[in-house]
Amino acid sequence: MEQDLIIRIIELLGTFAFAISGIRHAAAKRFDWFGGYVCGVAVAIGGGTIRDVMLGTIPFWMTTPIYLICTGVALFTVAFFGKWMEPLKNAWFVFDTLGLALFTIAGIQKSLAFGQPFWVAIIMGCLTGSAGGVIRDVLLNNEPVIFHKEIYAMACVLGGFVYWGLVTLGISAELCAIVSFVITCVIRFLAVKYHISLPVLKENDNSKNI
């Protein structure tokens, strides 16, 4: 399978998963349909747009309307099937995690396709996977998940290093993507299940007197 096609498929799947997550958060805030769609679009294309601008290329969603259509499908999915998905305790979290892993891989692969070194590709993968969530939280007036709670962006970084290691061993791009996807998801699932997070910065008592 051609590299461009792989990236396109991953971006499409990631768009749907992230759009579902963003629209669900908007629904929890009692947004109307338009507000939910805007939130879904922001999550779905935010990270990839920043990545493409930094790579000096046209943002992926501007080359075809399929991504905006996909977000529309996600909106109708939440609007009409959300009540059946609500009893599934972790359904919304799963969509967010799938989007995170898929967009991380898409960011890495696209950066490598543009000839970037691997350390840049990992940063771009992390940006693609997590920036949309930051935009979502800002729109919803929430503290961005990436800055607190369980491991989020670090799951992207670790998944990126796994991808790099497999590529170094000469593994095919398809298998690298699958393994990296699984690892990123597993790290995120375990982090939430066992409340694993990075150390929290604490303000020095002396600084309060300054």
What annotation goes with each model-predicted range?
Residues 1, 196-210:
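Intrinsically disordered, low-complexity non-transmembrane regions of multi-pass membrane transporters
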Residues 40-48, 96-109, 127-128, 151-164, ...:
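Small-residue-rich segments of transmembrane alpha-helices in multi-pass membrane proteins
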Residues 34-40, 64-69, 89-100, 122-124, ...:
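Cytoplasmic-side transmembrane-helix entry/capping segments in multi-pass membrane proteins
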Residues 38-42, 49-55, 123, 127, ...:
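Short, structured motif recognition centered on aromatic/hydrophobic residues
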Residues 3-15, 59-73, 117-129:
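Structural signature of hydrophobic alpha-helical transmembrane segments
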Residues 73-111:
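Ordered, amphipathic secondary-structure segments that act as subunit-interaction surfaces
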Residues 1-6, 52-62, 106-120, 165-176:
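Helix-coil boundary and interhelical linker segments in multi-pass alpha-helical membrane proteins
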